[in-house]
């Protein structure tokens, strides 16, 4: 069973955004659609993240999982599209990515999975991290014994066994994670993976990047870079990477009403982080939320949520989702380029309790002319919500993406 493009257009007629009157730029338009109607069915597909598998007819592969409460995630599934995200197949479970009992009476699962295609081995590497639940189904051990886990889908479409990414750094004795994070694959097949980590006895986490080898079966850390810290609450979280031109960029979630950005020439050794600001120097006000890169060969963009007059009472200001172009030299956002990817629905000031909020999203370049942003609504009373997709139309082709 698939979700048809006809139903997309019928359910969201009039949501194409031509951006008339906006300054000439790379983003020509944004077209929004519903992938799965979780508000109606009660089955909410969360953490939708896709990657592109090249070929004569490229395939898109998405990982996603159901959510039934705050951080209460279930079996990780996969879906695919063979028509550039016009339709998606019914989600199917990935073997081994459900819950499993632990010796101390908990259940261990997997969440926050990000799939990415690895050209050298023609595999999809799907990486998330482990998560624990007690007998009542509530989140347990949120800050200890957490680590990255991954599965590999080979070129024949078969999923391998769940594996742990091992790291013997004593500064990561409590936990180390690469959850929801964008990675960068190098020309030689090595992979740059961003990590957030901390030792036992210390609450705030640091971030760094590691270089991994990958042979299509095993992922191994062989080198790590310098560490950034921010000793406020849980510190620095959920770093994501992008490469633009000859430089690497990392965006970082934080818990001091800021997000941070830094740049590197090799993807391992990073300049001092700085808060995300507008090009006039005013810092963005964020609330421990993710940011995601939206790369294009002619410009680097960031997708994010932030404080806005329309969302003052929405938890963590998690909607709207915005996009802006980055000034890669100054490491700031160009205010005049900001656009709304997913708008706020309802009244975020006087009736915020009824506003579906977002905040867990991902970007995927699907063709030279298009990228997509995928996310899922959360409605607090029911944890129901629709799974959403925004199609970004580029005014110029993205030369980093080949048709086949």
Pin down the residues of each PLM region:
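Short amphipathic alpha-helical surface patches that serve as generic macromolecular interface elements
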Residues: 320, 357-360
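N-terminal secretory signal peptides and thylakoid transit peptides that target proteins
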Residues: 1-15
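Conserved beta-strand position repeated once per blade in WD40 beta-propeller domains
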Residues: 47-49, 112-114, 180-182, 238-240, ...
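Generic low-polarity alpha-helical segments
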Residues: 5-9, 115, 148-150, 293
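Beta-rich carbohydrate-recognition and catalytic domains
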Residues: 23-44, 52-108, 117-176, 184-238, ...
């Amino acid at each position: 069973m698939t979700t048809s493009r006809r139903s997309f257009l019928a359910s969201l007629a009039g949501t194409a955004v031509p951006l008339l009157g906006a300054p000439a730029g790379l983003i020509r338009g944004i077209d929004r659609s519903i992938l799965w109607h979780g508000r109606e069915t009660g089955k909410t597909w969360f953490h939708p993240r896709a990657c592109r598998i090249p070929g004569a007819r490229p395939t898109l592969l998405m990982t996603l999982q159901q959510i039934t409460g705050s951080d209460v995630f279930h079996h990780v599934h996969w879906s695919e599209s063979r028509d550039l995200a016009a339709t998606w197949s019914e989600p199917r479970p990935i073997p081994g990515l459900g819950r499993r009992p632990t010796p101390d009476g908990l259940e261990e699962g997997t969440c926050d999975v990000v799939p990415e295609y690895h050209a050298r081995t023609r595999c999809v590497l799907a990486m998330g991290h482990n998560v624990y639940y007690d007998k009542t189904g509530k989140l347990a051990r949120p800050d200890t014994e957490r680590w990255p886990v991954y599965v590999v889908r080979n070129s024949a479409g078969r999923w391998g066994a769940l594996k742990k990414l091992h790291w013997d750094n004593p500064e990561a004795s409590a936990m180390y994670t690469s959850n929801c994070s964008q990675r960068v694959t190098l020309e030689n097949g090595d992979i740059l993976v961003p990590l957030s980590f901390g030792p036992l006895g210390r609450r705030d986490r640091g971030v760094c990047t590691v270089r991994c080898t990958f042979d299509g079966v095993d992922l191994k850390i062989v080198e790590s870079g310098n560490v950034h810290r921010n000793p406020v609450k849980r510190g620095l979280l959920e770093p994501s990477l992008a490469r633009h031109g000859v430089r690497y960029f990392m965006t970082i979630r934080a818990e001091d009403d800021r997000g941070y950005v830094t740049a590197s020439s090799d993807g391992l050794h990073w300049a001092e982080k700085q808060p995300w600001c507008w090009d006039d120097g005013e810092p963005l006000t964020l609330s421990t939320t993710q940011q995601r890169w939206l790369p294009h060969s002619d410009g680097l963009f960031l997708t994010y949520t932030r404080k806005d007059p329309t969302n003052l009472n929405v938890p963590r200001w998690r909607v709207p989702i915005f996009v802006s172009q980055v000034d890669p030299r100054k490491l700031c956002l160009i205010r005049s380029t900001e656009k709304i990817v997913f708008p706020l629905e309802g009244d975020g000031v006087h009736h915020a309790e009824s506003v579906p909020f977002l905040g867990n999203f991902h970007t995927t370049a699907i063709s030279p002319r298009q990228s997509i942003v995928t996310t899922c609504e959360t409605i607090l009373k029911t944890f129901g919500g629709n799974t959403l997709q925004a199609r970004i139309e580029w005014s110029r082709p993205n030369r980093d993406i080949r048709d086949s």
